[in-house]
């Protein structure tokens, strides 16, 4: 067995597992009454948009090119450098290191091709829609595609560093500043730079990122972190499905490195008054602060609706705000119930007044906070309309 055979075997197993997850959720009734009508609706709206009519055409005329840049920014946050490593591979590192190295190189090539496929799909779907309104030529759009693809690969190479190194507040702030500078600089380059220079920047980003990624691939010092990240990538779709289910749950893929919480260390109390109600509330808030998955879910939901609000016309902003307030409260309810379903809380009385009072209070506090952020984004977006 060589690295190429091992790669294709694990790639097939990966997609087979994802297909089983989708098959478990989408049976023939769901496909017949929900999925197929949704696909037909999207195709119908796309044809109307191509012909210059329909609801989406009016929305795109108001939003102009801002919605496209928002979509590009969201794509930048997706993807990762795959390795297809497993915990059992550590046994072969001493004797068959070359096979693991070949596996990681093929996985790196697959990650680049998957990223390129995303941008090509967006390119061929969006180009016919904006060519008549933005007045962009095929050569200019190709240069833009080259730049965005190179920038995305550069972000993926930076994500490799975050996986290998322990997380900290200073590192998170630095990474956020780098992303903000690159996004702002990209907007300036896209608007004011000629297509040849824009394509050159994209090629430089791609060349630099490939060299960095190849060096990281040849190293085995972060084997445990890469295995953990691979588990998260494999379970991402299943976790998205299970997040909406109260009866089912996904096992959390934990990092082996022990980290101290940033807030309320050493079990420091949040509430001075100790009652059954405050005990439930303190448990829930500490889990929300220390469990990155729950915080990430709420952050992704808020980010998606914030972008939608910024690029939408006024009437669609109102609809987005109403939808977000309902979805946010529903997800917070699911999270609270999952937290309280922990094994050490089996003997607690979940039918008591204190439990329901704490449940309502916790959900209301976070719901009002997230809704306020969304309303603030809507107010700021009105300044640019």
Swiss-Prot record:
Keywords: Cell membrane, Membrane, Transmembrane, Transmembrane helix
InterPro entries per UniProt: EcsB_ABC
Tagged with keyword Cell membrane: yes
Top-level lineage group: Bacteria
Spans traversing the lipid bilayer: 24-44, 67-87, 106-128, 133-155, 176-193, 197-214, 304-324, 365-385
Subcellular location field: Cell membrane
Membrane-topology annotation of the record: Multi-pass membrane protein
An annotated GO cellular component: plasma membrane
Protein's UniProt name: Putative transporter YthQ
Organism (species): Bacillus subtilis (strain 168)
């Amino acid at each position: 067995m060589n690295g190429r055979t091992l790669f294709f075997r694990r790639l097939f197993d990966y997609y087979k597992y994802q297909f089983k997850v989708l098959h478990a959720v989408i049976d023939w009734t769901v496909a017949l009454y929900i999925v197929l009508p949704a696909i037909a609706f999207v195709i119908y709206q796309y044809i109307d948009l191509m012909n210059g009519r329909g609801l989406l055409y009016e929305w795109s005329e108001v939003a102009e090119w801002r919605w496209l840049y928002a979509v590009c920014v969201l794509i930048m946050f997706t993807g990762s450098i795959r390795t297809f490593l497993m915990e059992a591979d550590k046994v072969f590192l001493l004797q068959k290191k070359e096979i693991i190295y070949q596996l990681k190189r093929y996985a790196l090539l697959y990650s680049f091709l998957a990223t390129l496929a995303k941008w090509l799909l967006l390119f061929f779907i969006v180009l016919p829609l904006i060519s008549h309104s933005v007045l962009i030529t095929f050569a200019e759009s190709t240069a833009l595609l080259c730049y965005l693809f190179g920038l995305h690969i550069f972000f993926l190479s930076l994500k490799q560093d975050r996986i290998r190194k322990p997380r900290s507040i200073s590192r998170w702030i630095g990474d956020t500043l780098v992303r903000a500078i690159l996004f702002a600089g990209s907007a300036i380059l896209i608007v004011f730079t000629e297509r040849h220079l824009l394509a050159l920047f994209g090629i430089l980003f791609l060349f630099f990122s490939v060299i960095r990624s190849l060096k990281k691939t040849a190293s085995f010092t972060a084997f445990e972190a890469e295995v953990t990240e691979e588990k998260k990538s494999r379970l991402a779709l299943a976790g998205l499905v299970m997040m909406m289910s109260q009866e089912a749950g996904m096992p959390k893929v934990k990092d082996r490195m022990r980290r101290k919480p940033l807030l309320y260390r050493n079990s420091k109390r949040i509430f001075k008054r100790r009652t059954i109600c405050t005990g439930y509330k303190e448990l829930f808030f500490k889990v929300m602060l220390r469990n990155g998955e729950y915080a990430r879910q709420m952050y992704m939901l808020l980010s998606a609706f914030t972008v939608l609000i910024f690029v939408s016309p006024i009437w669609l902003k109102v609809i987005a705000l109403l939808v977000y307030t309902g979805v946010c409260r529903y997800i917070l309810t699911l999270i609270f119930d999952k937290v309280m379903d922990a094994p050490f809380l089996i003997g607690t009385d979940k039918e008591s007044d204190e439990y329901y009072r704490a449940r309502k209070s916790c959900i209301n506090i976070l719901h009002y906070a997230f809704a306020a952020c969304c309303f603030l984004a809507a107010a700021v977006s009105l300044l640019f309309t």
